[in-house]
């Protein structure tokens, strides 16, 4: 059998797929030829198969370096569910388990060993020397670079692998890395003339929406309505601070939403419990800081919300990538305010890599303020160009309409000028709205001619308009002067009537009714592959129930048994024999033998 046929047969037998995704076959062939590689592939794009399949085809054990115990656990469970011998050597095991794992590695009974960078460095002169290693895979490789968004110092020592094991190929994998990070990965790992594979970063199943100028109460209301529209679907809410994760979670819990909290300030036990509850669908939502997510391989996360502006496009892209890993339609929402921008600018200015972090934040700001296709901006950031708009972001769905906003701009700039440019955004809105706040009255600003000049415009709309004015360059924020607003020459031209100002019309969504929150998710979304009708929905729910029952029996996450995508395909194909069940994409030989009878018997009840 030639190499290509062997690769395809292994893919079908263990993973249940008839064909490779773009670049996978090329990457696997390259690794089988004992060559180093750097693989950039989006979350859900099939990175893992790029090293798991070569591990199955080569003699010996593949050593996979992974930064999180939870990520190792998830990967190992998925491999075992596919009938592949795998294990994870880490501190969560007891000593007996680790002794058994070491013996299995030395005896060649494992095809893949997952290990943390710290553990690998401790074992490089001991266990690794006694093993027959087929390849090294460095997962989440961006952690090696100080320019990356998840820098881990211990990753920088991975360069010793090529020195000690010069004949063993190394493949580094990441979902997000700009050019400078890619170069740093290659240099620090001492990769030997590596080939760099860059897959498309496009995730067309993920919708992109930005909501600007929302205050806390408005955000909370919008989030509740969003969750109600999504029924019981799983989602993640990312917040900038630990305190905010807890206040948002408490708000959701009071509304009866099953919600957990995850941040670095909680105990390891608490974080593990939250993650396990989420993976096993015991809670619907996790409110988290950026500490959450890298260890999540949950394929049926249907939405991601950013409560605050992320610090970089890399962080943002990786976090929205938690949604829709199964390829089904998923939604993301980013809330953006001037307060976020001011705070993040302060953090970036005080960081060790001030210039780089400010540049990354500026690119994130440009994305949030864009009035062109947002997906094109994301793809362009990662060096990928496209000539077509996506049709699945808020800009494409509702192209911005402009109006003559000269008077609005003049009111704002006049208020700034009359305070001698000594006010911040919040105080400016108080003046324009005519609010007798303590700060307004304390400084006598209620006597200004512009006091109350904009009371007909809601606070949220003022936030949006001021964001637009900042983007248009009518004023700047003096971050080193208590965030005071300074009028630019362009702003002066508008203020004194020398030029006009065009602003974008703010679009307001209608609120979801209380009745609407109980409405079932539309079948067209649940069954995007063409199935329709209540009977299909009933079958899908029955399949989901059986999957949960089987998963609970084995103490596994439900998506490890079968993904939502596979359940949808079962709804459409309705196999009535075990052989037909095994033909479904995503069902390998092991799962066919293990689960085929139960699922086929259930499907027959709907067919006969």
Regions found by a protein language model. Give the residues of each.
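Flexible coil/turn residues that form the inter-helical turn or adjacent wing/linker of helix-turn-helix
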Residues: 166, 231, 371, 421, ...
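Short helix-to-turn junction characteristic of helix-turn-helix DNA-binding domains
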Residues: 31, 227, 278, 368, ...
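Accessory DNA-binding and partner-docking regions appended to nucleic-acid-acting proteins
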Residues: 1-7, 356-358, 387-608
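Helicase motor core with emphasis on the C-terminal RecA-like subdomain
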Residues: 3-14, 18-22, 26-48, 56-58, ...
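Short, charged low-complexity linear segments at domain edges
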Residues: 353-382
């Amino acid at each position: 059998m030639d190499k290509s046929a062997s690769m395809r047969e292994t893919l079908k037998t263990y993973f249940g797929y008839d064909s490779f995704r773009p670049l996978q076959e090329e990457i696997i062939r390259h690794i089988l030829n004992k060559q180093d590689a750097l693989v950039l592939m989006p979350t859900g794009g099939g990175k893992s198969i790029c090293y798991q399949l070569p591990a199955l085809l080569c003699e010996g054990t593949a050593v996979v370096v992974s930064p999180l115990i939870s990520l190792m656990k998830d990967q190992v469970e998925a491999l075992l569910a596919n009938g592949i011998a795998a294990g994870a050597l880490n501190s969560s095991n007891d000593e007996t388990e680790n002794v058994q794992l070491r013996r299995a590695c030395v005896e060649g009974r494992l095809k893949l060993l997952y290990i943390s960078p710290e553990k690998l460095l401790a074992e490089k002169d001991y266990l690794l020397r006694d093993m027959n290693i087929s390849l090294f895979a460095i997962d989440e490789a961006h952690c090696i670079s100080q320019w990356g968004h998840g820098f881990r110092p211990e990753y920088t020592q991975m360069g010793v692998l090529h020195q000690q094991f010069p004949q063993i190929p190394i493949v580094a994998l990441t979902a997000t890395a700009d050019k400078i990070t890619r170069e740093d990965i290659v240099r620090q790992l001492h990769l030997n003339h590596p080939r760099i594979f860059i897959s498309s970063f496009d995730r067309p199943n993920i919708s992109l929406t930005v909501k600007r100028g929302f205050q806390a109460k408005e955000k909370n209301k919008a989030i509740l309505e969003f969750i109600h529209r999504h029924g019981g679907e799983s989602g993640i809410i990312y917040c900038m601070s630990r305190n905010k994760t807890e206040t948002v979670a408490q708000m959701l819990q009071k509304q009866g939403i099953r919600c957990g909290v995850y941040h670095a300030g909680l105990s390891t036990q608490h974080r593990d419990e939250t993650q396990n509850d989420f993976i096993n669908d015991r809670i619907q939502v996790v409110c988290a800081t950026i500490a959450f997510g890298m260890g999540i391989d949950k394929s049926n996360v249907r939405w991601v919300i950013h409560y605050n502006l992320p610090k970089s496009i890399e962080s943002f892209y990786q976090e929205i990538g938690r949604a829709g890993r199964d390829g089904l339609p998923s939604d993301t929402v980013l809330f953006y305010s001037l307060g976020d921008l001011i705070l993040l600018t302060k953090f970036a200015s005080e960081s060790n890599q001030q210039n780089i972090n400010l540049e990354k934040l500026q690119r994130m700001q440009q994305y949030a303020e864009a009035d062109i296709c947002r997906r094109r901006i994301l793809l362009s950031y990662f060096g990928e160009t496209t000539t077509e708009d996506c049709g699945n972001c808020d800009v494409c769905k509702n192209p911005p309409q402009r109006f003559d906003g000269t008077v609005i701009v003049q009111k704002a700039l006049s208020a700034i000028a009359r305070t001698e440019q000594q006010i911040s955004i919040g105080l400016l809105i108080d003046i324009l709205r005519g609010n007798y706040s303590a700060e307004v009255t304390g400084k006598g600003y209620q006597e200004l001619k512009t006091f109350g000049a904009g009371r007909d415009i809601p606070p949220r709309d003022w936030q949006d308009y001021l964001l637009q004015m900042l983007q248009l360059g009518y004023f700047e924020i003096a971050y080193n002067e208590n965030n005071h607003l300074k009028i630019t020459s362009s702003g002066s031209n508008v203020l004194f009537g020398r030029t006009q100002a065009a602003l974008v019309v703010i679009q307001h969504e209608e609120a979801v009714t209380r009745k609407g929150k109980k409405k079932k998710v539309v079948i067209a979304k649940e069954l995007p592959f063409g199935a329709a009708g209540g009977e299909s929905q009933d079958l899908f729910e029955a399949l989901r129930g059986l999957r949960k029952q089987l998963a609970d029996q084995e103490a596994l996450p439900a998506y490890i048994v079968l993904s939502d995508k596979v359940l949808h395909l079962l709804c459409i194909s309705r196999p009535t024999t075990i052989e037909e069940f095994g033909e479904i994409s995503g069902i390998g030989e092991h799962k066919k033998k293990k689960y085929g009878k139960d699922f086929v018997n259930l499907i027959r009840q709907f067919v006969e």
